[in-house]
């Protein structure tokens, strides 16, 4: 009698339904988005489905999916749809993937990039604590495949923390990435109410510091959500911590509750306050600060071109004039 292979079990949207907080907030006007439509949107969706790919746009219920897909851009989410962690802000499924990997994924992603004609690609992934290297080799292999099939295409890697293992970080850095990102997500005080207990404020900063020290020529980047109960003083502390750890670019966006079973929104931050935060960040020396209600780590990643000749720091001077090299 043939024994059937066990299928991974997971929790849909990453949160048990018993954790529901029955609060329905009316979103302000500035957070309203259009319904996804259009020929380009349909073509991107078709390519993603045909190549059995996952995108963070879909899995994380991103509000910008219509705008980004209609522009022919997407953020690819590697290593499946099941994350081994359960952050309380995130809609990605959580569970045990049982070591399963699609070994054809790097080639499929590279081909999709070619079919879409992308000049700038953002790669992210679920956490894979079930794998000895956290998926670092698979991540690096995907970057290499993209670069091989799409010469001139720039790649941003938004990685897991790999348990803080510097050798795993180096695997990705040595694959040819142009931007290395790891998200802080929130301020120090709120880290464990917001992120999985295995995540760490200090570890994320350590990963970013190691990335900058190992590859000074690679742009380092992080992202923080607002509206979870943080204060402006705590935000400034987080920005100072990022600068002290060599972070070049930081983004700020409004936290939006993906389901009723996730953390509630404490407040909606106005566009004017986002503008103030951007100016404060620039005054602290960031190469770029992107802040706005609908800003996400990879939002409009391909459109913010480095057009600051003569103003780049020495360690990034080689990037001047590079077409379509984005800061976020």
UniProtKB/Swiss-Prot annotation:
[4Fe-4S] cluster 1 binds at residues 57, 62, 68, 298. This is Lipoyl synthase. Residues 69-287 form the Radical SAM core domain. Pfam families: LIAS_N (PF16881), Radical_SAM (PF04055). PANTHER family: LIPOYL SYNTHASE (PTHR10949), LIPOYL SYNTHASE, MITOCHONDRIAL (PTHR10949:SF0). Disulfide bonds: none annotated. Pathway: Protein modification; protein lipoylation via endogenous pathway; protein N(6)-(lipoyl)lysine from octanoyl-[acyl-carrier-protein]: step 2/2. It comes from Deinococcus geothermalis (strain DSM 11300 / CIP 105573 / AG-3a). CDD domains: Radical_SAM. It catalyses: [[Fe-S] cluster scaffold protein carrying a second [4Fe-4S](2+) cluster] + N(6)-octanoyl-L-lysyl-[protein] + 2 oxidized [2Fe-2S]-[ferredoxin] + 2 S-adenosyl-L-methionine + 4 H(+) = [[Fe-S] cluster scaffold protein] + N(6)-[(R)-dihydrolipoyl]-L-lysyl-[protein] + 4 Fe(3+) + 2 hydrogen sulfide + 2 5'-deoxyadenosine + 2 L-methionine + 2 reduced [2Fe-2S]-[ferredoxin]. One of its GO terms (cellular component) is cytoplasm. Binds 2 [4Fe-4S] clusters per subunit. One cluster is coordinated with 3 cysteines and an exchangeable S-adenosyl-L-methionine. It is found in: Cytoplasm. InterPro entries: Aldolase_TIM, Elp3/MiaA/NifB-like_rSAM, LIAS_N, Lipoyl_synth, rSAM. Belongs to the radical SAM superfamily. Lipoyl synthase family. GO terms for molecular function: 4 iron, 4 sulfur cluster binding; lipoate synthase activity; metal ion binding. Keywords: 4Fe-4S, Cytoplasm, Iron, Iron-sulfur, Metal-binding, S-adenosyl-L-methionine, Transferase. The gene is lipA. Its cofactor is [4Fe-4S] cluster. [4Fe-4S] cluster 2 binds at residues 83, 87, 90. It comes from the Bacteria.
């Amino acid at each position: 009698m043939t024994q059937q292979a066990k299928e991974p079990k997971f929790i849909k949207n990453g949160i048990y339904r018993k954790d529901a907080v029955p609060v329905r907030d009316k979103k302000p006007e500035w957070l309203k988005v259009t319904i996804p439509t259009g020929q380009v949107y349909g073509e991107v969706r078709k390519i993603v489905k045909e190549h059995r790919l996952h995108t963070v746009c879909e899995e994380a219920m991103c509000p910008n999916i219509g705008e980004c897909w209609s522009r022919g851009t997407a953020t690819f989410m590697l290593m499946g749809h099941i994350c081994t962690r359960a952050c309380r802000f995130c809609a990605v499924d959580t569970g045990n993937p049982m070591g399963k990997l699609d070994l054809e994924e790097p080639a499929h992603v590279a081909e999709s990039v070619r079919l879409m004609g992308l000049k700038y690609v953002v790669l992210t992934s679920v956490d894979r604590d079930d794998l000895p290297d956290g998926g670092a080799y698979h991540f690096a292999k995907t970057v290499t495949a993209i670069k091989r099939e799409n010469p001139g295409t720039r790649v941003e890697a938004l990685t897991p923390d790999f348990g803080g293992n510097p050798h795993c970080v180096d695997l990705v850095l040595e694959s040819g990435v142009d931007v290395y990102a790891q998200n802080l997500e929130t301020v120090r005080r709120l880290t464990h109410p917001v992120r999985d207990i295995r995540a760490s404020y200090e570890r994320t900063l350590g990963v970013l510091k190691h990335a900058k020290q190992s590859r000074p020529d690679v742009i380092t980047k992080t992202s923080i959500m607002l509206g979870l109960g943080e204060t402006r003083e705590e935000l400034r502390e987080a920005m100072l911590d990022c600068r002290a750890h060599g972070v070049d670019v930081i983004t700020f966006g409004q936290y939006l509750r993906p389901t009723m079973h996730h953390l509630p929104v404490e407040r909606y931050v106005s566009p004017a306050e986002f503008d103030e935060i951007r100016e404060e960040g620039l005054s602290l020396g960031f190469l770029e600060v992107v802040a706005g209600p609908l800003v996400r780590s990879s939002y409009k990643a391909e459109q913010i071109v480095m057009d600051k000749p003569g103003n780049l720091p020495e360690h990034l001077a080689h990037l001047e004039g590079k077409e379509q090299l984005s800061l976020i």
